[in-house]
Design a protein with these regions (language model features):
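Short alpha-helical segment immediately N-terminal to, or the first helix within
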Residues: 8-9, 123-124, 137
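Basic, Lys/Arg- and aromatic-enriched nucleic-acid-binding interface segment
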Residues: 1-16, 20-22, 30, 66, ...
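Acidic donor-binding helix in nucleotide-sugar-dependent glycosyltransferases
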Residues: 18, 133-136
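Catalytic-site neighborhood detector that most strongly recognizes the C-terminal catalytic loop/helix
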Residues: 40, 131, 138-163
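C-terminal secondary-structure termini that scaffold catalytic or DNA-interacting sites
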Residues: 31, 44, 50-58, 62-67, ...
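Short basic/aromatic active-site micro-motif
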Residues: 90-91, 109-128
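Active-site/catalytic core of tyrosine-dependent DNA strand-transfer enzymes
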Residues: 31, 39-42, 64-109
């Protein structure tokens, strides 16, 4: 279960609460999309499904083919899954524990669950996508929020200068 949760978090860049609120009805496997329209929170000891963090958090995300296949396989493993059942009936603490365990076993530094979202945005920046396109995908309210991730690529400035040198010599 945690494997699939972490796959969605990384490859779609969604928030932890958005992940924990997902139901089968949020997936369109023909179109390979994932609809984000709610969020999970624990308030006063009770599980609560709320509206997303911001207006732009309501969105449809295109999933990569391999992730779409993985999630279809995951659904086949879930017994008695209803269209409105949470597909990850976990707490945020359970995700955090799973991440800590996975990091320890693999010998890497422990990261926060939210760092998977940062990594997704960073990957898309590195792939050359615009801040606007990335912001729309991850539900950022403004492009300025997406620009906060620019510091994650310190070599970009050097690469730019190198490419400008090549351009000038042509």
């Amino acid at each position: 279960m945690l494997y699939y949760a972490f796959e969605i978090l990384y490859w779609c860049g969604i928030r932890e609460g958005e992940l924990l609120a997902l139901t089968p009805a949020d997936f369109d496997f023909k179109r390979k999309t994932l609809r984000i329209n709610k969020s999970y929170q624990r308030l006063q000891g009770k599980d609560v499904i709320t509206t997303p963090k911001t207006k732009k958090s309501n969105r449809v995300i295109q999933m990569p083919d391999f992730l779409c296949d993985e999630i279809q396989d995951y659904f086949k493993q879930l017994y008695g899954l209803e269209p409105d059942s949470r597909i990850f009936p976990l707490s945020k603490y359970a995700l955090k524990r799973g991440m800590a365990f996975g990091c320890k076993v693999s010998g890497v530094k422990v990261i926060r669950i939210h760092d998977l979202r940062h990594s997704h945005v960073s990957l898309l920046i590195n792939m050359g996508y615009s801040a606007v396109a990335i912001g729309n995908r991850v539900g950022h309210e403004s492009v300025e929020i997406t620009y906060r991730y620019a510091h994650l690529f310190p070599t970009v400035q050097k690469e730019m200068a190198d490419k400008l040198n090549v351009e000038r010599s042509n």
